[in-house]
Structure formats: structure tokens, C-alpha cells
From Swiss-Prot:
Name of the featured protein: Glucose-6-phosphate 1-dehydrogenase
PANTHER family for the chain: GLUCOSE-6-PHOSPHATE 1-DEHYDROGENASE, GLUCOSE-6-PHOSPHATE 1-DEHYDROGENASE G6PD
Entry EC number(s): 1.1.1.49
Reaction catalyzed: D-glucose 6-phosphate + NADP(+) = 6-phospho-D-glucono-1,5-lactone + NADPH + H(+)
Coiled coil (UniProt feature): none
Higher taxonomy: Bacteria, Bacillati, Cyanobacteriota, Cyanophyceae, Nostocales
Keywords: Carbohydrate metabolism, Glucose metabolism, NADP, Oxidoreductase
UniProt family annotation: Belongs to the glucose-6-phosphate dehydrogenase family.
Species whose genome carries this gene: Nostoc sp. (strain PCC 7120 / SAG 25.82 / UTEX 2576)
């Protein structure tokens, strides 16, 4: 296996520069995201010599931990979640840059204490006043944390102070607008990094290159040649220990409004004027503003929700959503959402986009598939059984890569055809692992590159698209009316009808 530094895809390319030393302050540092994803991502960047050794991490949470105890907890987390990563001399050096500051989100004294610690660390670690404030806390704490940071003067420098906000950004259009108002009171837009870790995945980033760097595909990327598009993000896990959060969010807020909408934007947007952050995000906003649910007057024809019931996963029986610990037995929270979008613009007029996401599905898989129109006349035997024989599929996870399906003649005397796939896989290069989403996003934020982060108007435009469904689904509902699908199956029957009514079917993955 070769290391990422020896990635053959990077041969001959100039590596991204190294950011300035800075302090990364993680609010909610006692949560599992810190030791599972955030600290490991930063350690990986240090291991690959992508960030300077002066990089400093300060954890903030309510627990009364010491610096040393915080370091011990991060090391335990690394050993548990990333057992294959060597923790030797480099980890010892890296961990000396880990510090902890106990405090309450709503206590001004906590922020003054934090401010004093950061000033001390600037002198000790040589971080030159550069700060990144990462809000890895429950969404209801976002406004208060931002107000307190702003009130303490820790967001005053628009060029040295950056604010990173985890999704979900609001729970509907009104709350997103309210949160944006708080952010804009204390920050310039170029200071704000609204993070969606899906945008850090290699295949998602490659989508822009694939579309706009290859002349053979872009001319086909329109209503003349594309029959429809499917975007799937399927999970095998259930609600697990997130019932408290999930009961308030559901699949639409947790996944579709952010992750799937980002995949949708990159698939449907026009070519940007340049590859700078604002040009790309402006095109994403434009396509969102042209997007609508196919039929807002008869919602069942364009938006379907569902819940998983008891079933079998990998030979083991699993409970239904309503019997999971912490879930209301009469819950109407969707664990599955399927939607049909139409785009009112020149490129995509009349081409449906089908999006679906759900928990307890047969496979963990994320994919975008472009289904091209049929040939005008069927000339070959057995091809008549195939509709949309040409499919371009971009696999986000697992086995990141791209495949193109087309028909070929089967060997033999008869003119019979079958479909074959031409594949590109990142794994075929012998690379141990493609870059993790969080390490790429951390690096971009430290470098001041907002390309993979969402802008205020983009967030609001995405909420606007799904508002017709939210306004209905947020109303009290009879639990008996919520479609069910058995754990280990793909979707409720109503979601099959969503696409079957158009003479199409979901792609089996």
C-alpha cells in the first residue's frame, strides 16, 4: 500500500500550502465527535505534515477536566476508534498542544477565562492570534455561543477569527434566517464556515472536475440526453443512542436538507465562472432557487416519509423505530424520506430528480446516478428488456468511484446484448484510504478556503425547497398514517409508487 503522500493521482501536482499556526477551539469537546473525528483528523494532518507543529487545540465543555485528563481522554479515544494509527513519539508531541478550558455556554465568565487562556497560548505556542471556533454542540446552543463569543470580542478580527458551525443549520427556514441574523451581527460572511462533512468526501469534490473538465460528458448533462437523476444516501444503522436528537430532526432535517441537497446542487448546477468559493456557491444558490417539489398540491406525488418497523439485519432481529429506547411509541418522525424535484431552468426543464435517504436499509451506500434517455429504436434482442441502459453512477461511499453502464454484444452467434460497467475506483490505485472528510475541511478552513462550506443564502434556499413538505409533516399526525418499511428493506411501498408512477424504478444498489 502507498501512503496518501505518495498518491499517484497527485504526482506532478503542487501540494496545497501549509496554513499559519492557529488555535482551534472546540466547543462540546467532551462529546464523542471530538475523539472520534475531530482530533483524529487534526492528528492525521499533522502526521502528513499538512499543518504546522504549533497548531493548538483547546477543548471547551462543562466537565471539570484538567489539561492532562483531556489529553488522556483523547488518546483513549484514538486507541478505541483508530486502533491502526500509530501513537508514538509524534502523538506525544502533538498531545502537548491539547488544552482544556471548562465552561458553560451561557456564562460570560467562562468566555473571559477562555480568552485569557488563548492569549497565554499565543505567547507560549506562537499562534499569532489566529483562532478557529468550532461549535460541536447541540444546535439550540449555537445562538448563545455566538453571542457570547461576539460579546467577548473573540470574533472581532475578520481575518484572524473564524467560526465553524456543524449542521443542522436551523430546523426550518425561519430558524435558519434567525440564526443567520445572529451570525451576521458578529461576523463577516467570509469568517463563517457552515460545515457539511459530505462535501469533504473525494467523490463529491471530484464531481465538479468530472463535469467541467471532461468535454465528453458536459454536452450530455441536460434535458436532451438525461431521462432522470437518482440520489441515494442509505444507512444500515438505526437511531442508536441519538433518539433525543433524532425525534426532533428526522430524516429530512438530519440528512436530506443538507447532505443530499449538496449532492443535488453539485449535480444540477451550471458551470461557475471560476473555481473560487463564491462563484461555485452562487451557482448552487441559483439552481436551488429554480428547484421545487414536483407537486406541492398533492404531496404524496412528490414527497414520501416512512418509518422502519421491526425486521432483520445481517441475520439478527432489530426493533422498529417506535420501540427504540427514547422514542415516543406514537412517534411520527420519519426515518425515511423520498422526494421528487423539478428544476425550472433551460438545462433541466422536465427532468425529475429523485432523492431518497433512510435508516435500517439493506446497505450503507451513497450514490448519484444519471440515467440517460433510451435510444429512439430498439434494434437488438434482449435490449428491449432494458430501459435507460446507459447509467453513469458516482459512488460516494463505500468503494468511492465512478462507473458507466452501457450495452455490449454477448459472445455467440446471436445478436444478444447485455449491460456492462466500466469502472474507476480510488481503491484501484492501492491507496490505503482516501482523505477523510474532516481533515480536508479542517485544512480548508485553516487556509481560508470556503469552497466546501455553505453560504447563508444557500442554507436558506435549501430550506425553502423543502418547506412545503415540512409544513405538512410538522403538523400532528395519526401514527397509523405514517408508511412503514421493514428494517432491512429499501423503502415503503409509497416510495416505490413515487417513482413507479412515472414509469421508472429505484436503482438497486
Amino acid at each position: 500500500m502507498v501512503s496518501l503522500l505518495e498518491n499517484p493521482l497527485r504526482v506532478g501536482l503542487q501540494q496545497q500550502g501549509m496554513p499559519e499556526p492557529q488555535i482551534i477551539v472546540i466547543f462540546g469537546a467532551s462529546g464523542d465527535l471530538t475523539w472520534r473525528k475531530l482530533v483524529p483528523a487534526l492528528y492525521k494532518l499533522r502526521r502528513e505534515r499538512r499543518i504546522p507543529p504549533e497548531t493548538t487545540i483547546v477543548g471547551v465543555a462543562r466537565r471539570e477536566w484538567s489539561h492532562e485528563y483531556f489529553r488522556e481522554q483523547m488518546q483513549k479515544g484514538m486507541e478505541e476508534a483508530h486502533s491502526s494509527v500509530e501513537l508514538g513519539e509524534l502523538w506525544q508531541d502533538f498531545s502537548q498542544g491539547l488544552f482544556y478550558c471548562p465552561g458553560d455556554i451561557d456564562n460570560p465568565e467562562s468566555y473571559q477565562k477562555l480568552k485569557n487562556l488563548l492569549s497565554e497560548l499565543d505567547e507560549k505556542r506562537g499562534t499569532r492570534g489566529n483562532r478557529m471556533f468550532y461549535l460541536s454542540v447541540a444546535p439550540n446552543f449555537f445562538p448563545e455561543a455566538i453571542k457570547q463569543l461576539g460579546g467577548a470580542g473573540m470574533l472581532d478580527d475578520p481575518y484572524k477569527h473564524r467560526l465553524v458551525i456543524e449542521k443542522p443549520f436551523g430546523r426550518d427556514l425561519a430558524s435558519a434566517q434567525s440564526l443567520n441574523a445572529v451570525v451576521q451581527k458578529y461576523c463577516k460572511e467570509h469568517q463563517v464556515y457552515r460545515i457539511d462533512h459530505y462535501l469533504g468526501k473525494e467523490t463529491v469534490q471530484n464531481l465538479l472536475v468530472f463535469r467541467f473538465a471532461n468535454a465528453i460528458f458536459e454536452p450530455l448533462w441536460n434535458r436532451q440526453f438525461v431521462d432522470h437523476v437518482q440520489i441515494t444516501v442509505a444507512e444500515t444503522v438505526g437511531v442508536e443512542d441519538r433518539a433525543g436528537y433524532y425525534e426532533k430532526a428526522g430524516a429530512l432535517r438530519d440528512m436530506l436538507q443538507n447532505h443530499l441537497m449538496q449532492l443535488y446542487c453539485l449535480t444540477a448546477m451550471e458551470a461557475p465562472n471560476s473555481m473560487d468559493a463564491d462563484s461555485i456557491r452562487t451557482e448552487k444558490v441559483k439552481v436551488l432557487q429554480a428547484t421545487r417539489l414536483a407537486d406541492v398540491h398533492n404531496l404524496s406525488r412528490s414527497a414520501i416519509r416512512g418509518q422502519y418497523s421491526a425486521g432483520w439485519m445481517k441475520g439478527q432481529q432489530v426493533p422498529g423505530y417506535r420501540t427504540e429506547p427514547g422514542v415516543d411509541p406514537n412517534s411520527s418522525t420519519p426515518t425515511y424520506v423520498g422526494m421528487k424535484f423539478l428544476v425550472d431552468n433551460w438545462r433541466w426543464q422536465g427532468v425529475p430528480f429523485y432523492l431518497r435517504t433512510g435508516k435500517r436499509m439493506p446497505k450503507k451506500v451513497s450514490e448519484i446516478s444519471i440515467h440517460f434517455r433510451d435510444v429512439p429504436s430498439r434494434m437488438f434482442q434482449s435490449a428491449a428488456q432494458q430501459r435507460n441502459a446507459n447509467i453513469l453512477a458516482m459512488r460516494i461511499q463505500p468503494n468511492e468511484g465512478i462507473s458507466l453502464r452501457f450495452d455490449v454484444k454477448m459472445p455467440g452467434a446471436e445478436f444478444r446484448t447485455r449491460s456492462v460497467d466500466m469502472d474507476f475506483s480510488y481503491g484501484s490505485f492501492g491507496i490505503e484510504a482516501t482523505s477523510d472528510a474532516y481533515d480536508r475541511l479542517f485544512l480548508d478552513c485553516m487556509m481560508g478556503d470556503q469552497t466546501l462550506f455553505t453560504r447563508a443564502d444557500e442554507v436558506e434556499a435549501a430550506w425553502q425547497v423543502v418547506t412545503p413538505a415540512l409544513s405538512v409533516w410538522d403538523s400532528p399526525a395519526d401514527p397509523a398514517t405514517i408508511p412503514q418499511y421493514e428494517a432491512g428493506t429499501w423503502e415503503p411501498a409509497e416510495a416505490e409508487f413515487l417513482i413507479n408512477q412515472d414509469g421508472r424504478r429505484w436503482r438497486r444498489l
